[in-house]
């Protein structure tokens, strides 16, 4: 994941051996907003599921998984959303994007252009 912008991961397909299971719709970060812990994936059946970062491999054109069982149900997604933050929430507050290091750590916070906050 070295040097990837968070927004570049949004809408990226999640695939198992070339079969699309869903698309990334948000990044889930720890409570401090310093490390990505996983992804909110909108699956083909219309259900949002949690994909832990440790079970995912970011590739140039997809997020690859080794098993469909890596996509956890809505209860786990809610658990991580409630105890952490999301890229969408950070973008509402003060940021335009984040740049991620190889282990999912936030290496850089990209401020909103002009420093404007929502509603300004």
Tell where the protein language model's regions lie, with residue ranges:
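Peripheral interaction segments used for macromolecular assembly
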Residues: 1-120
């Amino acid at each position: 994941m070295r040097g990837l912008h968070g927004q570049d991961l949004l809408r990226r397909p999640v695939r198992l051996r070339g079969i699309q299971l869903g698309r990334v719709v948000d990044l889930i970060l720890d409570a401090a907003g310093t490390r990505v812990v996983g992804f909110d994936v909108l699956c083909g059946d219309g259900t949002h599921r949690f994909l832990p970062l440790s079970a995912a491999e970011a590739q140039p054109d997809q997020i690859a998984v080794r098993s469909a069982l890596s996509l956890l149900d809505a209860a786990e997604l809610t658990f991580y959303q409630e105890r952490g933050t999301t890229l969408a929430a950070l973008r509402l507050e003060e940021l335009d994007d984040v740049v991620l290091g190889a282990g999912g750590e936030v290496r850089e916070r990209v401020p909103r252009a002009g420093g404007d906050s929502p509603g300004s």
